[in-house]
Regions:
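Membrane-proximal stem/loop segments at transmembrane-domain junctions that anchor or position
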Residues: 244-330
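Transmembrane-helix motifs of polytopic, lipid-linked glycan transferases
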Residues: 91-111, 353-360
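Short hydrophobic/aromatic helix or loop-helix immediately within or flanking a transmembrane segment
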Residues: 58-92
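Membrane-interface alpha helices of multi-pass inner-membrane proteins
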Residues: 168-187, 196, 228-238
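Hydrophobic, aromatic-rich transmembrane alpha-helices
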Residues: 99-100, 329-367
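Extracytoplasmic loop-helix module adjacent to an early transmembrane segment
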Residues: 18, 22-62, 72-77
Length: 421
């Protein structure tokens, strides 16, 4: 028993727990559950990269960054029997989650608290946060998990860490956030809100709770973080610009962009009513239920599906829509009622907020802890309301907000167990 404790408390033991427990959980799920894609978007990416549609890999697919699609397409050429796009998602999630848990163990060791704290945090996170994305793969959520790992790594960095450790942290954050951006750009924007909070947290603790550091070192630390964020943003958008430039040379991509302009303008979220209950509106433009269902499957070959009919449907629906507040409340209510997972996760965030600020936080720093918690949970609430207002609130969008908020709060829980920063 003593030998086991010695192994667990060693540096190798922390790596073993972080990666081993995650691997065990993944193995059990993959062996006992059917893994599938949550939406058709990922299926289309996979078909293009694997060459199922054309006979050869097509990395210019609209939903994926060109520089991410090329290596996956090459792997399909070398070993076409393996599901490389699915493997990418699983490996990206596994590595990101393991790194986050490794940060938990590092913080526990630095604070000299019981190993039970990070173990419980890891098990809770795996069971209640990361199992759904594993069995129902979606590139929005994979991008979120990649980016969240950078949020946790940055938030767990200590000013007393070795220079080599800090270099590794910056390098990992850069790669993880770049991959997150390349996997799904839209989820990257919400991730960057939480990453910015992690960076501000690092800067604030440097000025407030590191009296041994000179003013010059504090300014240098701030400059490093700001320079890193600027370089990251420039790199991400630079890669995106080049990717779009290459992809737009393809006639197929140009044709898709033309079609997508119609889809976004007329048939995107909240821009048209369901067929049931609105038969008169659709019959007025010679649409039956089959025509309507064809548009849901992105099939636009019917001659009755044209700019005139789409405009008629959209304008009629927009004229009868409820107020912005009513629409926002309705979308959030539907999300709450449709998924018990949402109810439990919101309750867990509230409990963590209460425990952090009333039970864990030290009195002399309680105001700072409360402020950080409010920024995290308040940012989560604001982004949730924004998505509800825009009508873009499926489960995957909610997960893109929940995961970084939950993991950031868990990181703060481990950081605030001790007065030392």
């Amino acid at each position: 028993m003593e030998k086991i404790k010695e192994i667990i408390n060693s540096r190798k033991g922390k790596w073993l727990l972080a990666f081993g427990l995650t691997f065990l959980c993944y193995a059990i799920v993959l062996l006992t559950a059917d893994v599938s894609y949550a939406t058709n978007d990922d299926s289309r990416i996979m078909y293009a990269l694997a060459g199922y549609a054309s006979g050869e890999a097509y990395p210019q697919q609209a939903f994926i960054n060109y520089f991410l699609g090329v290596p996956i397409g090459v792997l399909y050429k070398l070993l076409p029997s393996l599901p490389w796009y699915t493997i990418y998602h699983i490996f990206a999630m596994y590595l990101s989650e393991s790194v986050m848990f490794l940060c938990f163990y590092k913080l526990a060791k630095d604070k000299k608290v019981s190993i039970a704290f990070p173990i419980c945090a890891q098990i809770i996170s795996l069971l209640f946060i990361f199992m759904v994305p594993l069995v129902s793969i979606q590139f929005t959520v994979t991008s979120t998990i990649l980016g969240t790992s950078a949020v946790v790594v940055m938030a767990s960095m200590k000013h007393s860490d070795k220079r080599s450790t800090k270099i590794c942290i910056y390098a990992y954050c850069f790669i993880a956030l770049l991959l997150s951006f390349m996997t799904r750009t839209l989820s990257w924007y919400s991730i960057m809100c939480f990453f910015a909070l992690s960076c501000v947290y690092q800067i604030a603790t440097c000025y407030l709770y590191c009296p041994d550091l000179t003013k010059k070192k504090k300014h240098l630390h701030t400059l490093k973080i700001c320079t890193f964020v600027i370089a990251l943003v420039i790199s991400c958008f630079g890669v995106r610009f080049v990717s779009l430039y290459i992809k737009n040379k393809s006639e197929i991509t140009q044709a898709y962009n033309t079609y997508n302009d119609y889809r976004v303008k007329y048939m995107d979220y909240g821009q048209h009513p369901p067929y049931k209950g609105h038969e008169k509106l659709y019959n007025a433009v010679q649409w039956d239920n089959s025509t309507y269902r064809a548009t849901l499957c992105l099939l636009y070959m019917d001659e009755n599906i044209n700019a005139s009919s789409l405009k008629t449907i959209t304008e009629a629906y927009q004229a009868n829509k409820h107020s912005a507040l009513s629409k926002t409340v309705t979308n959030i209510r539907e999300l709450l009622y449709d998924y018990s997972f949402v109810q439990y996760s919101l309750l867990s965030i509230f409990l963590i907020f209460v425990i952090l600020n009333l039970m864990v936080a030290k009195k002399e720093k309680q105001w700072f802890h409360i402020l950080v918690s409010i920024c995290c949970c308040g940012g989560f609430a604001v982004l949730l309301l924004y998505l509800g207002f825009k009508g873009r609130l499926p489960l995957r969008s909610y997960q893109s907000l929940l995961i970084p908020c939950f993991m950031f709060m868990m990181t703060m829980f481990l950081r605030w167990l001790d007065v030392s920063y």
